[in-house]
């Protein structure tokens, strides 16, 4: 593929301005940010209408939206549950379903899961449940669209050095927790965003043309030992 235009769906106009500038700098002028909350089906419709009008088709879809709210059993609220499930599971279901009419044979879908689907930490039960759900969506969906030529796979990262990971921990405990997480990795370090991007790029590429319905765990082996 000689040229790749990238559309980034982003929740919130201010985030579009910030992420959009960074994406254009890193990826190039073919990048565009469009406001879209994946839990809002009308905003998804607007997103895909804009893509159809300008590009007519989607070759690669990466369903990356997701977040967590830490809460132990006994303190989980309905509001927390609904917000996590609306984004992490409902959002993914309709992100993919509404994209399918724009995808042709040879296209690829990559769902971003998490090793929390198999090893959720304390206070991560709701988040872990949504990520386990993604794994089973992929298993079922490849049967639903059998013969379409569209592949669906999952990339499940472990801890990755991003701002969202740093913000997840209290300031006075952050370095200690990150050091502990690093010891869990059998390659001696935490993941970098580039590690996940390379895994996604592989599963979306023609090199993975005979790979369908798998979960590729990218965590330095931490969940395997």
Each model region followed by its residue ranges:
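Substrate-binding pocket helix/loop in short-chain dehydrogenase/reductase
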Residues: 72-73, 77-85, 181
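Short C-terminal tail/terminal secondary-structure segment
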Residues: 119, 201, 212-225
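Alpha-helical segment proximal to the catalytic Tyr-Lys
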Residues: 101-102, 143-147, 209
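Short, flexible catalytic-loop segment of classical short-chain dehydrogenase/reductase
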Residues: 135, 152, 157-167
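Active-site helix of classical SDR
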Residues: 96, 130, 138
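The beta1-alpha1 cofactor-binding region of Rossmann-like NAD(H)/NADP(H)-dependent oxidoreductases
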Residues: 36-46, 78, 194-195
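Residue(s) in the substrate-gating loop at a strand-loop-helix junction
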Residues: 114
């Amino acid at each position: 593929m000689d040229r790749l235009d990238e559309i980034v769906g982003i929740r919130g106009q201010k985030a579009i301005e910030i992420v959009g500038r960074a994406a254009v700098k890193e990826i190039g002028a073919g990048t565009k940010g469009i406001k879209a909350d994946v839990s809002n089906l009308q905003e998804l419709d607007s997103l895909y209408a804009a893509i159809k009008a300008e590009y007519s088709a989607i070759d690669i879809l990466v369903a990356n939206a997701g977040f967590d709210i830490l809460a132990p059993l006994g303190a989980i609220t309905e509001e927390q549950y609904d917000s996590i499930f609306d984004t992490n599971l409902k959002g993914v279901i309709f992100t993919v379903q509404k994209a399918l009419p724009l995808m042709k044979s040879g296209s690829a879908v990559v769902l971003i899961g998490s090793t929390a689907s198999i090893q959720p930490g304390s206070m991560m039960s709701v988040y872990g449940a949504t990520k386990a759900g993604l794994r089973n969506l992929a298993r079922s969906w490849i049967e639903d669209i059998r013969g379409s030529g569209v592949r669906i796979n999952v990339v499940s990262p472990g801890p990755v050095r991003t701002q969202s990971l740093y913000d997840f921990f209290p300031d006075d405990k952050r370095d200690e927790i990150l050091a502990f997480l690093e010891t869990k990795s059998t390659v001696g370090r935490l993941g970098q965003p580039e590690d996940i991007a390379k895994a996604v790029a592989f599963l979306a590429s023609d090199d993975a043309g005979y790979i369908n319905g798998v979960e590729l765990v990218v965590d330095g082996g931490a969940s395997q030992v």
